[in-house]
């Protein structure tokens, strides 16, 4: 029950007609244009950071409802097609707007987190997610706190799952992050702190010790 109220709450940022469309899609997906629904969700995710982190739950509910109602996957197919388009244009998006780029990464990672096939993450999303995270680990992105913050947040959410899908790529990603932390001189103090925290987080088996948690939490809030 808690989930449905959260979904309703997240839909409030849309106009009333779109809210109605989404509410219907959540309950009766066969009666609405699911291509339009997927476009609406992606469009909003690219401009609304809070929604981009929560949209996976709504997409998951619609996918489940459609499978149950018609045994179909129209919504998922349209969603993944649109994600593929946005993914291909990611560098242009990043140049145009850091905020839109960060929203795109959050959204792709959120879909990876929520949309499962037989309780496993979708293999088709593993490399796109890694590609986004590798882009955030490049030296020009590590200078930007907004991008570092996004990178660390995604690794907190899905790092463990992602590593299980491809440990070699995770090792390569963390080699980049370690080099950035040790060798890059133009990091902000907050960027450096966030990188140190995520390095420790993975080293601890994707969790922080109580002591480390208290330390980082106090540093971030100060």
Swiss-Prot record:
* GO annotation, cellular component aspect: cytoplasm; cytosol; histone mRNA stem-loop binding complex; nucleus
Q: What is its main location?
A: cytoplasm
Please provide, alphabetically and separated by semicolons, the GO molecular function terms listed in this UniProt record: identical protein binding; RNA binding; translation activator activity
One Pfam annotation reads MIF4G
Q: Which SUPFAM superfamilies match?
A: ARM repeat
Task: Spell out the InterPro entries in the cross-references.
Answer: ARM-type_fold, MIF4G-like_typ-3, mRNA_TranslReg/HistoneTransl
* Keyword Cytoplasm found: yes
Instruction: State the UniProt keywords alphabetically.
Output: Cytoplasm, Nucleus, Translation regulation
Where is this protein localized, as stated in its record?
Cytoplasm; Nucleus
| Domain (MIF4G) ranges | 3-205
Which terms under GO biological process does the entry name? Answer: cap-dependent translational initiation; regulation of translational initiation
| Similarity section | Belongs to the MIF4GD family.
This chain's function reads: Functions in replication-dependent translation of histone mRNAs which differ from other eukaryotic mRNAs in that they do not end with a poly-A tail but a stem-loop. May participate in circularizing those mRNAs specifically enhancing their translation.
Assembly, in brief, is:
Interacts with eif4g1, eif4g2 and slbp; probably tethered by SLBP to the 3'-end of mRNAs ending with the histone stem-loop, it also interacts with eif4g1 which is bound to their 5'-end.
- Write down the PANTHER family for this protein, in alphabetical order: EIF4G DOMAIN PROTEIN, MIF4G DOMAIN-CONTAINING PROTEIN
* Record protein name field: MIF4G domain-containing protein B
């Amino acid at each position: 029950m808690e989930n449905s109220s959260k979904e309703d709450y997240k839909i409030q940022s849309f106009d009333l007609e779109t809210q109605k469309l989404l509410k219907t899609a959540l309950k009766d997906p066969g009666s609405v244009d699911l291509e339009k629904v997927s476009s609406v969700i992606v469009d909003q995710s690219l401009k609304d950071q809070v929604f981009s982190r929560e949209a996976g739950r709504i997409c998951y509910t619609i996918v489940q409802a459609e499978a149950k109602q018609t045994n179909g996957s129209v919504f998922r197919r349209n969603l993944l097609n649109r994600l593929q388009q946005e993914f291909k244009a990611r560098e242009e998006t990043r140049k145009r707007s850091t905020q839109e780029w960060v929203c795109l990464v959050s959204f792709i990672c959120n879909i990876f987190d929520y949309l499962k096939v037989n309780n496993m993450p979708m293999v088709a999303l593993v490399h796109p997610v890694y590609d986004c995270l590798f882009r955030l680990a490049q030296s020009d992105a590590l200078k930007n706190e907004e991008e570092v913050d996004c990178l660390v947040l995604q690794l907190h959410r899905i790092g463990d799952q992602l590593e299980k899908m491809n440990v070699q790529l995770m090792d390569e990603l963390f080699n980049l992050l370690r080099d950035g932390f040790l060798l890059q001189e133009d990091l902000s103090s907050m960027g450096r702190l966030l990188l140190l925290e995520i390095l420790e987080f993975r080293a601890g088996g994707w969790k922080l010790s109580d002591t480390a948690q208290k330390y980082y939490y106090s540093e971030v809030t100060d």
